[in-house]
A protein has these predicted regions:
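Beta-strand-loop-alpha "switch" segments that mediate conformational coupling across diverse proteins
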Residues: 154-160
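Short, glycine-/small-residue-rich phosphate/pyrophosphate-handling segment
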Residues: 93-94, 107-154
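N-terminal beta1-alpha1-beta2 submodule of the flavodoxin-like/Rossmannoid cofactor-binding fold
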Residues: 1-108, 161-184
Length: 184
């Protein structure tokens, strides 16, 4: 049974990206995955201070917050999903902060062989205009994977045209997220 960790990074409670996370989770569970869904907005993750103490000592980050727990969960997962709304053509501040703090996950980077990652993003822009937004966010995701060294990109879902919280509920994007979840 594969362990699947889904990290939803929207600061909004009834977020469209959260709906897609739950659809992905349902598909992954039906495929036999053991799924854990975490909302980053509920976690205390401070900004990286750039002190490099984690690199110099090899003992992780000196900041005592929820990032330590999240890095451990990433280490235990076979598959992880990063989900975000698109804000100003990139990932949410919550996801960017998580990515920046992952420098303290050096051990994860050395032991990440065989792990797979998925990316889910939601843009309020209509599909015809959302492509540029998604390209920038996809670049942030792929850059993160490159830093992790040996994590395989398993799938990307870029939803568009969904502005109001919950407006994605009755769209084709839900089925696409569910089907992508079944591929774990």
């Amino acid at each position: 049974m594969k362990k699947v960790l889904i990290l939803s990074s929207s600061p909004v409670e009834n977020a469209n990206s959260g709906f897609l996370c739950r659809a992905f989770a349902k598909g992954a569970e039906e495929a036999g995955g053991q799924v854990e869904l975490i909302s980053l907005r509920e976690k205390n993750i401070r900004f990286c201070q750039g002190c490099e103490a984690c690199v110099k000592t090899g003992k992780g980050c000196v900041q005592q917050d929820d990032m330590t727990e999240l890095i451990e969960k990433m280490q235990q997962a076979d598959v992880f999903v990063l989900a975000t709304p698109i804000y100003f053509m990139t990932v949410s501040a919550q996801l960017k902060t998580f990515m920046d703090r992952f420098i303290a996950g050096e051990q994860f980077m050395r032991q990440s062989s065989g792990k797979k990652a998925y990316f889910i993003s939601v843009s309020a822009a209509p599909e015809a205009r959302a492509k540029e937004n998604h390209e920038a966010a996809n670049g942030a995701f792929r850059g993160f994977l490159k830093c992790l060294r040996s994590v395989e990109e398993a799938g990307v879902l870029n939803a568009a045209g969904c502005y109001a919280p919950g407006s994605i509920a009755d769209t084709e994007w839900m089925a696409k997220a569910y089907e992508m979840g079944k591929t774990v």
